[in-house]
UniProtKB/Swiss-Prot annotation:
Taxon lineage: Eukaryota, Metazoa, Ecdysozoa, Arthropoda, Hexapoda
UniProt function note: FMRFamides and FMRFamide-like peptides are neuropeptides.
UniProt KW keywords: Neuropeptide, Secreted
The protein, known as: Extended FMRFamide-10
Subcellular location as annotated: Secreted
GO terms, biological process: neuropeptide signaling pathway
Superkingdom classification of source: Eukaryota
GO cellular component: a single term: extracellular region
Family: Belongs to the FARP (FMRF amide related peptide) family.
Native organism: Mantophasma kudubergense (Gladiator)
Keyword flag Secreted: yes
Coiled coil: none
Length: 12
């Protein structure tokens, strides 16, 4: 799951 709410990169 993409977590670009706070602005950090996470695994898809």
């Amino acid at each position: 799951p993409a977590a670009s709410e706070s602005g950090f990169r996470r695994d898809p």
